[in-house]
């Protein structure tokens, strides 16, 4: 089997040296991706296309599908490469190849020609088109919007009978631009923004801020691995997980409610910038869109950017949510995003949409920055190729109950402000308050002869914290969802 890879048009307008470099990198990327399907395949680069030849016919569909997902490819032609003698020979070979496809259809013939011949491309189109029209009674010629377009390519003494054309994702080959670090949460925005930078030629590493246990991290790892495996597997990348729970706890205890959102984002940018510097990455990528939430106003985004010299790229800055969701659907991350948890504990009641720099800096003076330094230092760096095995391991399941027994106690894990605004009272059972950000250090002080039913407003944080406690060896925890 043979495929002809056509380059993304922006590659073809580069200078000769840049174009050759891009083609060389794309050729290497294709080899890296396809070697898993057929180790004997050949990838040969030319000035305006790349040839892929493989022997294992059983891998035809898999190879074709993989090619459509490699950045830098405009479209793929599946071809049959045969010698020819003259125009009549071209017609006869085209008749054998296309007769069944043209029965009862309108068609036209389109020819591209390279080399020296005694005929032009239009001559071949007319001759082959006329012959097909005469020999297939139910077919008729239609030059605009036909049912079938017969694509032929003539190169010197070879004829390429094009059996199918398949669109690629375009963009630049990964590795032609510098590395970036994507702040990934597993939602719609961060997945799409990561894909957009891969498509633009960047090797995308991932940085995840874990706010609540293993279950969420496993979900985000699955998203990152999916994106890498589908669009970027030609290169090795990192998945860096930072336990941000201590940072969130410090913010909730010491920072004014209205400033929490902006300060949390500033802390994330500080942490990600340190990770980027550690690994020589040139820029951060976020999924922020202008005005989507309170921290994404121009004033707040400027304040967030000010905490670091690292370039922050926001490919979705002008996109609306519907457009982002449509893109997520196209690339296959929509289902992941819809089931990804949102946190009920890290939400300001009255977030500022126009933060003042002096106020933000005054609030940050209350923050213990040694906590931030520590979580960055302890960040977990994983080769994304190892994630497939890790995510297959079962997460410890935690029982969810809607009632309670005589030895049960409800543990309200909401933040202090939420508890004061909406105190939880349940008839017939004691309710104890312990904010989620103190569970890791204070849960062991509670009566371990009791069964603790964790509760929060949405049920997401309580489940994740229960999973975390189970991982720490506490088996006397359940999730309470009345």
UniProtKB/Swiss-Prot annotation:
GO terms for biological process: detection of UV; L-cysteine catabolic process; thiamine biosynthetic process; thiamine diphosphate biosynthetic process; thiazole biosynthetic process; tRNA 4-thiouridine biosynthesis. Signal peptide: none annotated. The keyword Transferase applies. Keywords: ATP-binding, Cytoplasm, Disulfide bond, Nucleotide-binding, Redox-active center, RNA-binding, Thiamine biosynthesis, Transferase, tRNA-binding. ATP binds at residues 183-184, 265, 287, 296. It holds the Pfam family THUMP. SMART domains: THUMP. Residues 61-165 form the THUMP domain. Disulfide bonds join 344-456. Pathway: Cofactor biosynthesis; thiamine diphosphate biosynthesis. It comes from the Bacteria. Catalyzes the ATP-dependent transfer of a sulfur to tRNA to produce 4-thiouridine in position 8 of tRNAs, which functions as a near-UV photosensor. Also catalyzes the transfer of sulfur to the sulfur carrier protein ThiS, forming ThiS-thiocarboxylate. This is a step in the synthesis of thiazole, in the thiamine biosynthesis pathway. The sulfur is donated as persulfide by IscS. Belongs to the ThiI family. This is tRNA sulfurtransferase. It comes from Escherichia coli (strain K12). The lineage of its organism: Bacteria, Pseudomonadati, Pseudomonadota, Gammaproteobacteria, Enterobacterales.
């Amino acid at each position: 089997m043979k495929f002809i890879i056509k380059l993304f048009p922006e590659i073809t307008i580069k200078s000769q040296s840049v174009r050759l470099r891009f083609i060389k990198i794309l050729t290497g990327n294709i080899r890296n991706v396809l070697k898993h399907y057929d180790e004997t395949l050949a990838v040969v680069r030319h000035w305006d296309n790349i040839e892929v030849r493989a022997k294992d016919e059983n891998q035809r569909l898999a190879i074709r599908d993989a090619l459509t997902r490699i950045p830098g490819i405009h479209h793929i032609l599946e071809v049959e490469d045969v010698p020819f003698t003259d125009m009549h020979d071209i017609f006869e070979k085209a008749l054998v190849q296309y007769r069944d496809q043209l029965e009862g259809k309108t068609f036209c013939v389109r020819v591209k020609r390279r080399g020296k011949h005694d005929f032009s491309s239009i001559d071949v189109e007319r001759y082959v088109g006329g012959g097909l029209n005469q020999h297939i009674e139910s077919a008729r010629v239609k030059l605009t919007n036909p049912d079938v377009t017969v694509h032929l390519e003539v190169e010197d003494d070879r004829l390429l009978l094009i059996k199918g054309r398949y669109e690629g994702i375009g963009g630049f080959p990964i590795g032609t631009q510098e590395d970036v670090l994507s702040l990934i949460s597993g939602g719609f925005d961060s997945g799409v923004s990561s894909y957009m930078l891969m498509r633009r030629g960047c090797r995308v590493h991932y940085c995840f801020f874990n706010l609540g246990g293993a279950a969420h991290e496993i979900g985000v790892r699955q998203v990152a691995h999916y994106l890498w495996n589908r669009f970027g597997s030609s290169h090795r990348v990192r998945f860096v997980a930072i336990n941000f729970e201590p940072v969130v706890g410090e913010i909730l205890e010491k920072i004014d409610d209205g400033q929490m959102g902006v300060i949390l984002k500033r802390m994330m940018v500080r942490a990600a910038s340190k990770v980027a510097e550690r690994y020589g990455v040139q820029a951060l990528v976020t999924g922020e869109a202008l005005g989507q939430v309170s921290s994404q106003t121009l004033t707040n985004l400027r304040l967030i950017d000010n905490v670091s010299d690292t370039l922050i790229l926001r490919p979705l800055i002008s996109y609306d949510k519907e457009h982002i969701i449509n893109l997520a659907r196209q690339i296959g991350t929509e289902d992941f995003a819809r089931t990804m948890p949102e946190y009920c504990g890290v939400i300001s009641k009255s977030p500022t949409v126009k933060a003042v720099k002096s106020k933000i800096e005054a609030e940050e003076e209350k923050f213990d920055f040694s906590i931030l330094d520590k979580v960055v230092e302890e960040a977990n760096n994983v080769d994304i190729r190892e994630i497939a095995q890790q995510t297959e391991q079962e997460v410890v399941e935690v029982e969810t109950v809607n009632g309670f027994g005589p030895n049960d106690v409800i543990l309200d894990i909401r933040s202090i402000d939420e508890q004061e605004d909406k105190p939880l009272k349940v008839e017939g059972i004691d309710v104890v308050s312990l904010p989620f950000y103190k569970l890791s250090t204070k849960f062991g002080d509670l009566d371990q002869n009791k069964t603790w039913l964790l509760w929060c407003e949405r049920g997401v944080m309580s489940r994740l914290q229960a999973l975390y406690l189970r991982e720490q060896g506490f088996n006397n925890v359940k999730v309470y969802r009345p």
